[in-house]
């Protein structure tokens, strides 16, 4: 039996690789001689660096950068190919998980550290970038990142604006006269599944501001500042389009990548599946295993298991999914190519206990074992 396993991380519980190895253990209890291939999986958010670094045979490096509130943080990123492609998660430098709830305030949080990571990768010879921009703590329109890469963002007195969204309030000049020269050689693929524009009722301030600590007054102010920022950018960069789908991703970081770096915004899942060449493994499989922490109606909306299932169905392969929990609307997954799905939680336990790594790994192994025991039973009755 040839089995391909590609399971997304169970956030806060198991990494993609841990989930895959646990599933493999369960299969081998029933089919000890099975040919099992474990491929790392992510959707462009958490786990993207690990998935691409492991899946493409790259290396991981670390750099100390400016965190969202100015304190130093250690950010890991991957280097692929012959050292020319860097894989970065912006959340490693400016993520909301780096802050406590009381620290969250988008007026002050900055993307400066994201620019520092890019700068470090450029210094190491990287010229191609894959960047996941989910999980941000910021709403600064990417101006912090731009400053770290040499852009001059000045107030009316010619002084560099401060970090955070407050810098947008005072912004009067945007100049690329002193930008890092190597940027002209760089390409950027941005893993982004958010389609929000920069401003307005569906813009980043209104939709994502509250979870980053913004109150209604701050939301209104930041939206106005971002609108003025876009108008200012258009004077020097005619292709500026704040209404572009995804411009509002990561507090306007998507806008900065589109406007100043001519980046492409792409489905995070598609980037992962393409770069790790998952189809090359699935085409020879007898069965495909996927999953994620929670399987629900949103799974079919561009999440990793649906991407795996789509490839599997191109080769007419059966797909089984395993998850921590399954909601009522998860039935939509059947139409997306997932033939059957199974929750791995066994017995009445607290959420905290169910998410403990050792507990989750054991549950994955035991559940997969029982499913494959059933498969063997039906095979033996033929």
PLM features per residue range, with description:
Residues 1-133, 137-382:
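N-terminal loops that bind phosphate or other acidic moieties
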């Amino acid at each position: 039996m040839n089995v391909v396993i590609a399971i997304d991380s169970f956030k806060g519980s198991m990494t993609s690789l841990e989930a895959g190895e646990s599933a493999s253990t369960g299969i081998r209890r029933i089919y000890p001689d099975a040919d099992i291939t474990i491929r790392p999986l992510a959707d462009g958010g958490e786990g993207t660096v690990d998935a691409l670094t492991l899946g493409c045979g790259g290396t991981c490096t670390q750099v100390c950068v400016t965190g969202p509130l100015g304190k130093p943080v250690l950010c890991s990123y991957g280097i692929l190919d012959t050292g020319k492609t860097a894989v970065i998660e912006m959340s490693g430098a400016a993520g909301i998980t780096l802050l406590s709830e009381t620290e969250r305030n988008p007026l002050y949080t900055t993307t400066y550290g994201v620019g520092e990571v890019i700068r470090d990768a450029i210094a190491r010879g990287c010229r191609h970038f894959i960047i996941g921009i989910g999980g941000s703590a910021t709403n600064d329109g990417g101006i912090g990142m731009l400053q770290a890469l040499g852009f001059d963002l000045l107030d009316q007195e010619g002084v560099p604006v401060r970090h955070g969204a407050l810098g947008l309030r005072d912004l009067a000049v945007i100049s690329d006269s002193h930008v890092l020269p190597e940027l002209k050689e760089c390409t950027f693929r941005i893993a982004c599944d958010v389609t929000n524009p920069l401003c307005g009722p569906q813009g980043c301030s209104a939709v994502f501001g509250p979870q980053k600590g913004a109150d209604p007054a701050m939301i209104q102010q930041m939206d106005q500042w971002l609108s003025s920022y876009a108008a200012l950018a258009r004077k020097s960069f005619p292709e500026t389009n704040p209404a572009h789908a995804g411009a509002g991703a990561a507090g306007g970081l998507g806008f900065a990548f589109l406007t100043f770096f001519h980046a492409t915004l792409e489905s995070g899942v598609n980037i992962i599946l393409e770069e790790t060449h998952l189809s090359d493994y699935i085409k020879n499989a007898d069965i495909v295993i996927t999953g994620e922490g929670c399987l629900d109606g949103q799974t079919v909306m561009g999440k990793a298991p649906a991407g795996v299932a789509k490839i599997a169905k191109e080769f007419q392969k059966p797909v089984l999914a395993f998850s921590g929990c399954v909601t009522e609307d998860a039935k939509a997954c059947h139409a997306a190519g997932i033939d059957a799905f199974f929750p791995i939680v066994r017995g009445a336990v607290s959420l905290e206990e169910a998410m403990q790594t050792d507990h989750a790994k054991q549950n994955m192994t035991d559940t997969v074992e029982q499913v494959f025991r059933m498969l063997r039973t039906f095979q033996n009755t033929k």
